[in-house]
């Protein structure tokens, strides 16, 4: 798939080892109970992900951009530890990753205007030499700027705020309302895969407008 992405003209790819997909499960002791070279220690649990990164780097060359997205926590006491997360990130940097995206499983519960993984992202940015991107709960321009100005974190990831307001960056650039209308209700997450992903707040607005016009 990575080779196809390069042939198609993409500048880089992201290896997803987050949100309990199979690669994420290798990293987490909550799922990984293996007793061979792919389980047991933090280094062993990271081995499969690192092997994939090395193979991608080998096939695509040193100039191709590779990102790694992984959980910094599993929202479970038996999940990945801070030490396990940092170890995996260090090994990924050594394997040739160009950037790491920090996420986890607590973003579903976040209804506050704060960057959920700021603390872990800050630690990682102080530990590694490669750029760090932190995502999870960014719905406020002040929160994003505060994170960038008060740490070595270089990038902020935004998702649900875009679903709610696709033009939110234009608003922020024009110094309009600094806060997204997104309330982290997670209805966009619950929508059936057979239909388009949308924000329930926008659907309600459309219904109100239709009623007004009628």
Per-region residue spans from a language model:
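Flavin-dependent oxidoreductase catalytic cores
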Residues: 1-214
């Amino acid at each position: 798939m990575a080779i196809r992405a390069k042939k198609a003209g993409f500048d880089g790819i992201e290896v997803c080892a987050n949100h309990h997909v199979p690669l994420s499960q290798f990293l987490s002791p909550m799922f990984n109970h293996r007793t061979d070279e792919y389980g047991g220690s933090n280094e062993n649990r990271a081995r499969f992900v690192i092997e994939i990164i090395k193979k991608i780097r080998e096939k695509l060359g040193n100039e191709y951009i590779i990102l790694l997205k992984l959980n910094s926590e599993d929202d479970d006491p038996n999940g990945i530890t801070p030490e396990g997360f940092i170890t995996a990130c260090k090994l990924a940097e050594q394997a040739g990753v160009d950037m790491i995206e920090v996420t986890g499983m607590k973003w579903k519960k976040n209804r506050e205007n704060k960057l959920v993984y700021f603390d872990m992202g800050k630690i990682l940015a102080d530990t590694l030499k490669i750029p760090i991107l932190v995502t999870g709960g960014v719905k406020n321009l002040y929160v994003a700027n505060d994170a960038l100005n008060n740490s070595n974190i270089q990038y902020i990831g935004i998702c649900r705020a875009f679903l709610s307001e696709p033009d939110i960056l234009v608003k922020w650039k024009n110094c309009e309302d600094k806060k997204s209308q997104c309330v982290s209700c997670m209805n966009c997450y619950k929508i059936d895969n057979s239909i388009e992903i949308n924000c329930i707040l926008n659907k309600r607005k459309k219904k109100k407008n239709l009623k007004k016009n009628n």
